[in-house]
Amino acid sequence: MQSITVALDAMGGDFGPRVTVPAAVQALSHFPELKVILTGDQQQITSQLSLLGYKPDARLSVQHCDRMISNSEKPSLALRNSQGSSMRHAIELVADSTADACVSGGNTGALMALSRFILKLLPGIDRPALISALPTVTGGRSWMLDLGANVSCDADTLFQFAVMGSALAEEHLNRAPRVAVLNVGEEETKGNDLVKRCAELLSQTQAVHFVGYIEGNQILKNAADVIVCDGFVGNVCLKASEGTAQLFIEKIKTSMMASSIKGWIARILFSELFNELKTLNPDQYNGASLLGLRGIVIKSHGSADVSALVNAIGEAVHEVKRQVPSRISDRLEAVLLERHY
């Protein structure tokens, strides 16, 4: 079995080593081929390992870094002052092939800026994009991009996002994904010039299976496998859907935990529904991929708990196995040839 090495920014996220270290240890038991390099404050990391009764070994190592990038740092400042940081070092381990992928729950803007600076973009890509899986009512999942890396885009950039998203989704689905552009209506006359031009470009290529427009109320209805939009729209949609799912889960959970007769009735009536709603829990889909780079970088939610971070590490393992950057590069090459002829 070929090993897969993930560089984990141990200082990233809201809870730092208190979550990243247990997640790394748990991930090792989930994925027998996995090795983890924890980057960050060695004293804090080893302290957490001691609490777990775990010592660094052949599968888990620690590389000390003097500083971390805070969530409040602007990307430009983080880029200038990133030397010696846990996030930068994790990305550099991918760049020099010590690690196969990087996972971080740290500052999104800084992660994107550093990844782009260190790993560079694939040929034919203007900007990287954040993509993540979303649950659907049918029990499957779809993928949406961009989720906040680029708040404004032109049509060519959205077209590139569609090509990259299709390549990633295909590695999960093992079939040609249905690609749609998020719009205010399904009719061809609806929408602004940006989405209309993007749809025009997608309808002219054989590189993706374009199915037209979808509206916001169809995002979770399995109407498409890949949903394309700019980062502003995507981030708002993502946060709204996550908040709605968490609201329903917490409301039913609160009712079921009540000690009164009302709680007893709720446990009888809603136990099956609660189990169904848990499949919509955003933690199960934690791990947004930063596509368009010459390496694999996974962004975890800053607020992720241990199990959610394990899911992000799992996404990194999957993308390494499926050689996602190479798949995207091949798809882009086909598009460039298609446009040339």
From Swiss-Prot:
Its main location: cytoplasm. Its EC number is 2.3.1.274. GO terms for molecular function: phosphate:acyl-[acyl carrier protein] acyltransferase activity. Pathway: Lipid metabolism; phospholipid metabolism. It is found in: Cytoplasm. It catalyses: a fatty acyl-[ACP] + phosphate = an acyl phosphate + holo-[ACP]. It comes from the Bacteria. GO terms for cellular component: cytoplasm. It is an enzyme of class 2 (transferase). One of its GO terms (biological process) is fatty acid biosynthetic process. Keywords: Cytoplasm, Lipid biosynthesis, Lipid metabolism, Phospholipid biosynthesis, Phospholipid metabolism, Transferase. InterPro entries: FA_synthesis (IPR003664), Phospholipid_synth_PlsX-like (IPR012281). Coiled coil: none annotated. Catalyzes the reversible formation of acyl-phosphate (acyl-PO(4)) from acyl-[acyl-carrier-protein] (acyl-ACP). This enzyme utilizes acyl-ACP as fatty acyl donor, but not acyl-CoA. PANTHER family: FATTY ACID/PHOSPHOLIPID SYNTHESIS PROTEIN PLSX, PHOSPHATE ACYLTRANSFERASE. Belongs to the PlsX family. HAMAP family: PlsX. Homodimer. Probably interacts with PlsY. This is Phosphate acyltransferase. It comes from Vibrio vulnificus (strain YJ016). The gene is plsX.
